[in-house]
Amino acid sequence: VAMALQAHDGYSFRFWRDARTDPRLRGPAREVLDRVGLGARAGVPAANLAHGEQRQLELAVALATGPSLLLLDEPMAGMGPEDSVRMVELLGTLKGKVTILWVEHDMDAVFALADRVTVLVYGKAIATGAPEEIRADPHVLQAYLGEEA
């Protein structure tokens, strides 16, 4: 996270200086980690974090750059139910602050977060609309549930 902040804020990279110990970066890095729920795990190497925590860390690195748009590819992939709920809550805190364009197969997460949904079947868009419209769309029901409309 500190390196993302370093790059975003225009600080020069110094080969012999560890970004994690730079006093200009420690506070902002900790704020981003707190924001994604990892403040208490700040000193833990990424490889030692649980899968869900690693996904939170990836999001923290992206948020450290101050994006106006986040592109997320299946942020819930490989997560258990508890981690998915935590990620949905975290992404929910970003609504209205950052535009998020994402691909996701966890429909509970999609319906909880999305303002607008486009459903693809074999790469072709079959429906676009609000979550409520998508839930009732006959083409979506046929394609994914095999139900007659």
Where do the protein language model's features map onto the residues?
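Glycine-rich phosphate-binding loops of nucleotide-dependent enzymes
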Residues: 1-149
